[in-house]
Design a protein with these regions (language model features):
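Amphipathic alpha-helical scaffolding segments comprising HEAT/armadillo-like alpha-solenoid repeats
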Residues: 23-32, 52-65, 85-98, 118-130, ...
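Short inter-helical turns and helix N-cap capping residues of alpha-solenoid HEAT/ARM repeat scaffolds
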Residues: 67-69, 100-102, 132-133, 164-165
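HEAT-repeat alpha-solenoid elements in large eukaryotic scaffold proteins
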Residues: 31-40
Length: 187
């Protein structure tokens, strides 16, 4: 057999069979992860953390799967942020900015930015305050507001540029009230 057909077979195996370094997730673990993703109740952070490290691979697979239910993808992304934040970080960035992704999935990505990206969350969240989707603007404003005084200032600055009925403006009003409560009066 010549080198060309062998190379073609190797490429096909890699494309169809996935990465050579990624071990398949055991069926029992995959079933456990899918059970949590499909639960009718809220799954606690402790339950996600109790999963073995291999669960991150299954969660990432679901979060990336465009054929999976958007709610499952959103839950998988949120859980991945708990189980392995380093694996969730690129997905959070990508999905938060993807205007073609379902709103529930974008919202989950935005909700996870602060916990997954830390200080780098601001560079993702601030531009989203101008997103065409109101739910994404609201979630971005809430995430920034919850991140501290600097985030509140970002929300307040953006709110000054839009209508008072915008979700960013409503969040900014609460933010500014909180800032006034925490800043001691000047004497």
């Amino acid at each position: 057999m010549s080198a060309r057909p062998i190379a073609t077979c190797v490429v096909l195996l890699l494309v169809l069979g996935g990465s050579a370094r990624a071990e398949p997730v055991p069926a029992e673990l995959r079933a456990r992860v899918e059970g949590l993703l499909g639960a009718y109740r809220a799954v606690t952070v402790a339950e996600w953390r109790a999963l073995p490290p291999d669960a991150a691979q299954a969660l990432e697979s679901v979060a990336r799967d465009r054929t999976a239910l958007p709610t499952w993808r959103a839950r998988a992304l949120a859980a991945l942020g708990v189980v392995r934040p380093s694996a969730a970080a690129p997905l959070v960035r990508q999905l938060a900015m993807d205007t073609t992704a379902p709103v529930v999935l974008r919202s989950a990505a935005v909700d996870g930015t602060v916990s997954v990206l830390g200080a780098a969350a601001r560079e993702v969240l601030v531009p989203l305050l101008r997103d065409p989707t109101p739910a994404v603007r609201l979630r971005s404003a809430q995430a920034l507001a919850g991140s501290g005084p600097a985030g509140c200032q970002d929300v307040a600055a953006e709110a000054r540029t839009g209508p008072a009925s915008d979700p960013v403006a409503r969040t900014a009003a609460r933010c500014e009230a909180r800032l006034r409560e925490t800043v001691p009066p000047v004497r």
